[in-house]
A protein has these predicted regions:
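N-terminal secretory signal peptides
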Residues: 1-29
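Short, glycine-/small- and polar/acidic-enriched structural segments
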Residues: 4-5, 51-193, 204, 208-214, ...
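N-terminal export signals
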Residues: 22-23, 29-50
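Small-molecule pocket liners
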Residues: 69, 135-141, 225-226, 246-250, ...
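Short, solvent-exposed loop/beta-turn-alpha elements that line the ligand-binding surface or hinge
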Residues: 82, 149, 233-243, 312-321
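Pocket-lining segment of extracytoplasmic ligand-binding domains
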Residues: 197-203, 207-291
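Secondary-structure end/capping motifs
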Residues: 257-336
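Conserved C-terminal helix/tail region of periplasmic/extracytoplasmic solute-binding proteins
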Residues: 327-355
Length: 355
C-alpha cells in the first residue's frame, strides 16, 4: 500500500528504519528451477558470484508482499548479478520511508507506488521515475459480510462508514474517485482511518466497507463479503479507470541521472528479466523466492494462489513506463484533491532511460 508523504524529510543511512534486507542469489535448487522455467542456460553459473566484481547498490521499498515479488524474484533468480549488480533490497515501513531514504542519500533507488512518488515530488523531493514493475493498485473495495446483499454497488455507499488506511493515501484517493464517478457526495460518507489492518473491522461489521489488500480480500470473500471494485483485476481497472493504473516502479535522484545511466539501464534489464520470470515460473517458486522473515506465520499456499490469480493483471512483462497509466494516477489524485494531482508528468519521469 502506498502511503502519504506529506511529512517528507531526508533520512540519512543511520536513520532508516530497516525491517529486512535481501541480498545475493538464492540457493542452487531454486536457481536450477528458475533456469528451467525461464528457458535460461547460464543462470547456474550465478550461484556463487564474485561479489567484488559486482556494483553494489541499495534499493528501498515498502514491505507489502505483492509489491516486492518482482524484486525478490529478480534477486533470487540471479538476474541482478547477471547484469553486474549486487543489489541490496531494503525493506522500510512504507513508501514514504523509502522515498525519505532516497531523498536523504541513504539508498540509491526507491521502489514505491506512483501515488507515493507524486506526493514526495510535490513536497520537494527532486526524484525521477524511470522503470515500472506494477500496473495496478494493490487494494479492493469490499463490503462487510453482513451487508453484502444490501450494498451492491459504489452508489449504495452513501451514508456509510468506509475504512481506508489513512486520509491522503492512495486507497483514500482511489475511494474518493470512485465515489465521484458513482455520483456520491464524499461528504455523505464517513471515512474511518484504521491503518492497513482493516480486515477485522470489516469482518465484524464495525465498518460497512473498506479498501483492503490480500490476503484480507480473500478471507473476507470466504466469509461472504461482496467485492465492489477490485483494483488488482485488469477488467475492473478497464471498467472503472479506463485502463492500467501505474503503481510500483523505481525512482532515483534527478541530479544523478547522467552518472547512473549505465547502472540504471542494467537495473532495468534485470527487472525486465525478473518480470518475465514472474509470469513464466510457478507461483510456488515465486513464494520460495521471498525471504522467510516476511512470510513467517503466513499461509504459503494462500499466497501462491493469490499470485496465480493476480500476477498476469498486476505485473507487466517489461519495465517500460505506460505514460497513460501514470496520467490516470495524477487525474485520480486531482479528483481527490491531493497535491499529487498538480504534478506535471513530464517533470517526474525519465522514459528515455529504458528506451
Amino acid at each position: 500500500m502506498s502511503d502519504c508523504c506529506n511529512d517528507l524529510g531526508p533520512l540519512g543511512r543511520e536513520e532508516v528504519d530497516v525491517l529486512h534486507v535481501s541480498r545475493g542469489v538464492s540457493r542452487r535448487d531454486f536457481l536450477r528451477g528458475a533456469a528451467g522455467a525461464a528457458g535460461l542456460t547460464a543462470i547456474g553459473g550465478l550461484v556463487s558470484p564474485v561479489w567484488g566484481q559486482q556494483k553494489r547498490v541499495r534499493l528501498a521499498f515498502c514491505s507489502q508482499l505483492l509489491c516486492v515479488v518482482p524484486y525478490e524474484a529478480t534477486r533470487a533468480a540471479g538476474f541482478f548479478a547477471e547484469e553486474g549488480l549486487d543489489v541490496e533490497l531494503v525493506y522500510t515501513r512504507g513508501g514514504s520511508a523509502a522515498l525519505q531514504a532516497l531523498n536523504g542519500g541513504a539508498v540509491d533507488y526507491a521502489a514505491t507506488s506512483f501515488d507515493a512518488a507524486l506526493n514526495a515530488f510535490s513536497n520537494g523531493a527532486d526524484i525521477v521515475r524511470f522503470a515500472s514493475t506494477g500496473r495496478l493498485p494493490l487494494f479492493a473495495l469490499a463490503t462487510s459480510p453482513d451487508l453484502a446483499d444490501e450494498i451492491k454497488g459504489v452508489e449504495a455507499l452513501e451514508g456509510r462508514t468506509i475504512g481506508v488506511s489513512a486520509l491522503g493515501n492512495a486507497d483514500h484517493a482511489f475511494m474518493l474517485y470512485l465515489l465521484e464517478r458513482a455520483g456520491v457526495d464524499p461528504d455523505s460518507v464517513e471515512f474511518a482511518t484504521v491503518g492497513t489492518n482493516l480486515y477485522d473491522a470489516i469482518r465484524l461489521g464495525q465498518l460497512d466497507a473498506g479498501m483492503v489488500q490480500e490476503p484480507a480480500l480473500t478471507l473476507l470473500q470466504e466469509r461472504g463479503s461482496r467485492v465492489l471494485v477490485n483494483g488488482m483485476d485488469i477488467d475492473d481497472a478497464n471498467e472503472y479507470l479506463g485502463g492500467a493504473y501505474e503503481f510500483m516502479g523505481v525512482a532515483t535522484r534527478r541530479g544523478e541521472l547522467e552518472e547512473r545511466n549505465d547502472e540504471m539501464q542494467a537495473l532495468a534489464r534485470a527487472l525486465g528479466k525478473g518480470l518475465r520470470f514472474v509470469q513464466s515460473t510457478t507461483p510456488e517458486r515465486l513464494v520460495e523466492s521471498l525471504p522467510s522473515e516476511i512470510i513467517t506465520g503466513g499461509d504459503r499456499d494462500r499466497l501462491a494462489n493469490t499470485l496465480e490469480r493476480y500476477r498476469e493483471s498486476l505485473y507487466p512483462t517489461a519495465v517500460d513506463m505506460n505514460l497513460d497509466a501514470m496520467q490516470r494516477v495524477i487525474d485520480v489524485n486531482r479528483a481527490a484533491g491531493g497535491r499529487g494531482g498538480n504534478v506535471d508528468l513530464d517533470r517526474i519521469v525519465a522514459p528515455e532511460v529504458v528506451g
